[in-house]
Amino acid sequence: MKPEIHPVYPPSRVTCMCGNVVETKSTRGSFSVEICSNCHPFFTGKYKLVDTAGRIDRFRKKYGASPTSAKKA
């Protein structure tokens, strides 16, 4: 490998909204995520509602689209 071309790869912390903290290495540093393997329904077997209605409402507000304005072919 060539010297002095690789980025610094320090330890970092990934924090989930459920409170789970994972220690890893990353060039990004510490950051947070919404869902991790500790709280994801696939791994836990429990159903968890993820709020996507807010994203849809923001999209409609931004672009002026309404559910009834969709054209049917």
From Swiss-Prot:
Names of required cofactors: Zn(2+)
Purpose of the protein: Binds the 23S rRNA.
Assigned keywords, A-Z: Metal-binding, Ribonucleoprotein, Ribosomal protein, RNA-binding, rRNA-binding, Zinc
GO molecular function per UniProt: metal ion binding; rRNA binding; structural constituent of ribosome
Short name of one Pfam family: Ribosomal_L31
Protein name according to UniProt: Large ribosomal subunit protein bL31
Entries under InterPro entries matching the protein: Ribosomal_bL28/bL31-like_sf (IPR034704), Ribosomal_bL31 (IPR002150), Ribosomal_bL31_A (IPR027491), Ribosomal_bL31_sf (IPR042105)
Residue numbers binding Zn(2+): 16, 18, 36, 39
PROSITE patterns associated with the record: RIBOSOMAL_L31
One of the GO BP terms on file: translation
Subunit structure of this chain's protein: Part of the 50S ribosomal subunit.
Family label: Belongs to the bacterial ribosomal protein bL31 family. Type A subfamily.
GO cellular component, one term: ribosome
PANTHER family noted in UniProt: 50S RIBOSOMAL PROTEIN L31, CHLOROPLASTIC, LARGE RIBOSOMAL SUBUNIT PROTEIN BL31C
Details of cofactor binding: Binds 1 zinc ion per subunit.
